[in-house]
Regions:
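Aromatic, loop-rich ligand-recognition surfaces of beta-strand-rich domains
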Residues: 5-108
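Boundary/entry segment of secreted carbohydrate-active catalytic domains
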Residues: 107-143
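Conserved, mostly hydrophobic/aromatic
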Residues: 115, 144, 193, 245, ...
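Active-site beta-loop-alpha junctions enriched in small/polar residues
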Residues: 117-120, 157-159, 195-199, 247-252, ...
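Acidic-and-aromatic substrate-binding clefts and catalytic sites of carbohydrate-active enzymes
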Residues: 123-135, 160-174, 252-255, 300-309, ...
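Glycoside hydrolase catalytic-domain groove-lining segments
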Residues: 134, 138-141, 288-295, 305-383, ...
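Substrate-binding cleft and catalytic face of glycoside hydrolase catalytic domains
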Residues: 143-271, 275-294, 300
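Aromatic-rich peripheral "rim/lid" segments of glycoside hydrolase catalytic domains that contact
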Residues: 264-265, 342, 346-347, 365-400, ...
């Protein structure tokens, strides 16, 4: 079958940075390019793409190597400009070697470009404001929508409030209903993230809700089902039915501790049975609301294949019928892109499930916007040398994650959610009541709420 080529305006060499430029007639979806060489050689090169020829993003995690006369490279992005940079040859050598480049169009698969904005209302209530790249004050959700964001992720806490270190009224059922309506009215689709806790739930803490702490396993099973059903039914009744629902948040070590904890001395068949029984209850509640809602089981081991396989094997052995594998992947904690890439490919091969990056973020600065220690400064953090904190690195990392997701066969890498792109430093609206924000260096807005150009990466992808 004949492939359609994109309309290109001009092809030029740039000797100043040893690169070959292709300018398209307009921003178009490019499926792949073919580089035709005049003679055989082991060429090492990078590919960059841009919407405006000012801000460039690396297509993937590193160099391409080719010794063929024709090199085919998958792009799968919307772009107006393509730049091929030869890594180890002089400009003269490059211009002699390069024959021409063909640019092919295609049909883009649906792709999730989501944001978790669970704390947006709190940030706004305490005075946070957001500005577009023209300096105009705007609704944060409207700015994100203009860059192509199409999903909002909202977490649900059972009964937040002191003494659980966060003000009541945020991330509870009523708050989620309000945010869901606001997001859907602006054209977003929804993922609802049940923490099954009154506060943060992650691998280091899965505090059982205070109202559930004295329940037996059987009673807990019923309470989890009822709470899940109640929240989702309320969303359904107001016309904001979610597309996806997470049963638990980063539950690598289990949830509802210690009842369904599965780490350390709790890593026993009996404990895994308890966890999977509870997961099945949550899934049943979701499907009772609508069979169309896809369920996500989410862990935080984006770069750890051994632990990921162990976790999802335990679920497979117990016939947990979920739809999507959800992973957190923070490069500063979870290892290099190559580890993430090999993990998601193996998980797809092993379980034939769709793969979703439920959380991702990266620092755009080494500065701190307030006096709260940033999460990127924690002792176990490892900033990759090739990606020093900068807007450019933030854009390149996000594009690399997307590239790997789109490389999974059959379009099974379905997308990502950027975690708290709006968490700018606003007094009183930090991660914990009365404290500052430990995430202000990983947002998609600067400390004053101005939009960063790294949001262009969202626009690159359909």
């Amino acid at each position: 079958m004949k492939r359609e080529t994109c309309s290109t305006q001009k092809h030029t060499f740039d000797s100043s940075n040893n690169s070959y430029h292709v300018e398209l007639e307009s921003i178009q979806y490019v499926d792949e390019i073919e580089i035709h060489w005049n003679f055989r050689y082991e060429y090492k090169y990078e590919i960059e793409i841009s919407l405006d020829s000012i801000h460039w993003v690396k297509l993937s995690k590193g160099e391409y190597v080719s010794s063929d006369l024709v090199s085919r490279n998958i792009i799968r992005a919307n772009t107006g400009y393509i730049r091929i940079k030869l890594a180890d040859q002089s400009a003269d050598r490059f211009s002699e070697a390069m024959k021409h480049v063909l640019v092919y169009s295609g049909t883009a698969a649906e792709f999730i470009k989501g944001v978790d904005v669970s704390h947006l209302t709190q940030i706004e209530d305490f005075g946070g404001k957001f500005y577009d790249r023209q300096g105009r004050e705007r609704d944060c959700l409207e700015i994100l929508k203009e860059y192509g964001c199409n999903y909002v992720r909202l977490k649900v806490w059972n009964k937040p409030g002191l003494p659980n270190s966060d003000p009541a009224g945020y991330n509870d059922k009523a708050h989620v209903l309000g945010m869901a309506k606001r997001a859907v009215d602006k054209g977003y689709r929804l993922l609802i993230d049940f923490h099954y806790s009154d506060w943060w739930a992650d691998p280091g803490k899965q505090f059982i809700p205070d109202d559930w702490k004295d329940l037996s396993l059987e009673q807990l099973n019923t309470a989890l089902y009822d709470f899940t059903y109640e929240v989702l039914n309320a969303l359904k009744l107001q016309g904001t039915l979610p597309e996806m629902v997470q049963i638990g948040n980063e539950i690598t070590n289990g949830m509802l501790w210690d009842v369904a904890k599965v780490s350390d001395e709790f890593d026993t068949p009996e404990q895994w049975d308890k966890l999977c029984t509870l997961l099945k209850s949550g899934i049943s509640a979701v499907k009772a609301i609508s069979e169309s809602i896809r369920t996500v089981i989410h862990i935080e081991r984006g770069g750890d294949n051994e632990k990921s396989r162990y976790f999802y094997d335990m679920l497979a052995e117990r016939n947990v019928a979920y739809d999507i594998i959800g992973l957190s992947y923070y490069p500063i904690w979870h290892g290099p892109i190559k580890d993430f890439s090999s993990n998601i490919r193996d998980l797809y091969d092993r379980y034939s499930k769709e793969i979703l990056v439920a959380e991702v973020a990266y620092p755009y600065t080494a500065e701190n916007g307030d006096d709260q220690l940033n999460a990127s400064s924690f002792p176990f953090t490892n900033i990759p040398e090739e990606y020093p904190p900068s807007i450019q690195s933030q854009a390149d990392i996000l594009q690399a994650v997307i590239y790997e997701l789109k490389s999974i066969p059959d379009n099974k890498g379905i997308g990502f959610f950027y975690w708290q792109p709006d968490f700018i430093p606003v007094k009183g609206a930090g991660w914990k009541y009365g404290e500052g924000c430990e995430w202000d260096d990983q947002t998609l807005f600067d400390f004053k709420g101005n939009t960063l150009w790294s949001l262009d990466v969202f626009k690159l992808h359909s």
